[in-house]
């Protein structure tokens, strides 16, 4: 029996030791985004995400040398922020291929437009603000930049807090306000909030659950699309289209998006594309988008017959469908 107690004590001590060993040191710049999120959650801090290309971008290297890597900046900003830098210098292509690919995926998911690029995130990874720094920025101008963003960041944090407490109606309203504040290209990062919304509004009493179901479909499809899993990306919208909560026009848009994704991927599965577009048309034949869908169906039929251009479903046509969907 004593041996069992000793063994149990050793196991407890081992677990405690391992747990301590896993604590992430956030007193300086991190280079792992997952570690940054864990540290931010554990320490209740914001995340300052900095995308750079030190070896190939003069602005990135100057900002690091004169501001971000200085002791004063790190000391001042690690009190409230977990600092994370994902760098895309050429030398990494030779030594860190796997991590570089993961970092590039994060760059794409956050719709980063250029190098360098700066975001303030919540511990969950939600975008609270975009920042901009001049090449000659110093600590004083950094204080101004962060200070100007503070009202926007604080408002986001207040809304995020409201999603966790209060009545269901108050929480749902806070989630919708966060979506309204977030750039459409970044709402896929809000997937956990969409899941929360749907769990709080199971009977769609708000009439807005379909928006969050659609957002979740886009989020999952984006992940699959980036992995080259086109069929799985299309399947997300096909699954969405079958949800009874959606209006006829929303169902139409879901089937259309599945078809468009497949067509734009270069797939030659024209019958499957046609099937998606036919289901889209049938879902709401009286909608404003229906006439455009009939044109798509004719174009795809020509491709099936070997008479059409494989790129016939154009970006202009896609924009037309999306505009009509928004107007509805």
Predicted regions, residues:
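Thiol-/selenol-based redox modules, centered on thioredoxin-like
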Residues: 134-211, 215
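Short solvent-exposed coil/turn linkers within tandem alpha-helical repeat scaffolds
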Residues: 133, 181-189, 198-213, 227, ...
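Non-catalytic, surface beta->alpha helical segment in thiol-disulfide oxidoreductase systems
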Residues: 67-68, 105-154
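Thiol-based oxidoreductase modules, predominantly thioredoxin-like and allied folds used
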Residues: 27-31, 53, 69-101
């Amino acid at each position: 029996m004593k041996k069992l107690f000793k063994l149990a004590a050793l196991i407890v001590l081992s677990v405690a030791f391992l747990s301590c060993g896993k604590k992430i040191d956030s007193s300086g710049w991190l280079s792992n985004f997952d570690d940054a999120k864990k540290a931010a959650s554990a320490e209740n801090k914001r995340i300052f995400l900095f995308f750079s290309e030190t070896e190939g971008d003069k602005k990135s290297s100057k900002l690091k040398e004169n501001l971000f890597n200085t002791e004063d900046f790190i000391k001042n900003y690690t009190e409230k922020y977990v600092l994370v830098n994902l760098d895309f210098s050429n030398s990494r292509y030779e030594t860190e291929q796997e991590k570089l690919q993961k970092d590039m995926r994060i760059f794409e998911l956050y719709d980063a437009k250029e190098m360098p690029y700066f975001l303030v995130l919540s511990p969950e990874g939600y975008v609270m603000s975009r920042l901009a720094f001049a090449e000659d920025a110093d600590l004083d101008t950094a204080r101004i930049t962060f200070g100007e963003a503070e009202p926007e960041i604080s408002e986001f944090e207040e809304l995020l807090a409201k999603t966790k407490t209060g009545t269901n109606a108050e929480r749902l309203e806070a989630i919708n306000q966060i979506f309204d504040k977030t750039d459409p290209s970044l709402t896929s990062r809000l997937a956990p909030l969409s899941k929360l919304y749907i769990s709080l509004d199971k009977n769609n009493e708000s009439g807005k659950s379909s928006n969050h179901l659609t957002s979740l479909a886009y989020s999952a499809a984006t992940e699959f699309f980036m992995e080259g899993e086109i069929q799985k990306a299309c399947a997300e919208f096909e699954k969405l289209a079958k949800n009874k909560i959606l209006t006829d026009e929303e169902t139409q848009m879901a089937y259309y998006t599945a078809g468009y994704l497949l067509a734009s991927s270069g797939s030659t599965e024209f019958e499957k594309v046609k099937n998606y577009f036919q289901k889209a048309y049938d879902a709401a034949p009286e909608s404003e988008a229906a006439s455009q869908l009939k044109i798509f169906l004719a174009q795809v039929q020509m491709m099936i017959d070997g008479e059409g251009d494989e790129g016939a479903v154009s970006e202009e046509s896609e924009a037309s469908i999306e505009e009509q969907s928004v107007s509805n």
